[in-house]
């Protein structure tokens, strides 16, 4: 039997299995329960947050026949009737998915709309799902406007896009819009714990935190990375194997760099960059991790201990962040954060990314406000020399 990747194996089959999109689930469930159904829905959000999944669950809810064949429109599709199983397997003739990224012309849209005049063959409703709808041409959008505004009673449109700003306002005004949010790292981590428990895969908490951060709000990306990590770690997930696979920088290096900058210790800064080079760790990832830590330090300096609520850091990382927040003045934290952000853009312009990283960090040191009368190398500041 062929292996089924985790992202497909654990794709939600009903609204109760959806993770991190409670606002969308509640709105659609209430609409289905009261049968106040719109004729066109637009789901927006970044990749891997559930737009296509919600579309399929909605199609099942509209066409579910019930386990006994006597069911109607429901917010809890049975999952076992002919309509539900056919939609799950992609065989339901009344549910059509069109990928607008590869079928973006007016001819493809007109071919789809020609089917709108025919009543459903198997279910109660025809459902036309157009994915990445923002990729359609202007002519294609214009061709579908009339049908989108006044479709037959048996037809529902579901549009999905990662870039709603590119969808014409004439289309937006005809749709009921739902924004699927990027998922918090803690939400992703909790779901990975459940998935790995069902897969009987051993893991440690820090490895899951790394995967959740790397997913950047996308559950599909998190499951794909988990698949890769299981293969890389020979069936087990540890912090070391996941960090190596992702090429991410150990926070201990980041804390060492920020502490050295706070103390004006240029020698430690250069030595730490040399260590990063020897270990093959990415310079851009180093600045990204530094920006993340500096942002959390700034929030701690403003809000105190209450700022830790909702962070996905381990206890040790949170303690180090708090220690550095107390060590570095708030204005210097802001300066370091700003230079780190701008420094990431400099990396691609330099012949050697580690040399560029060194220069960015030394720039942080050079522009660091100081009340001392000497620089790191013991020379008098320029202003004093002029005097």
Model-predicted regions and their roles:
Residues 76, 382-387:
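Short, intrinsically disordered, charge-balanced linker/junction segments flanking boundaries
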Residues 82-93, 108-114, 124, 150, ...:
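Extended, largely alpha-helical regulatory/partner-binding modules appended to the mid-to-C-terminal parts
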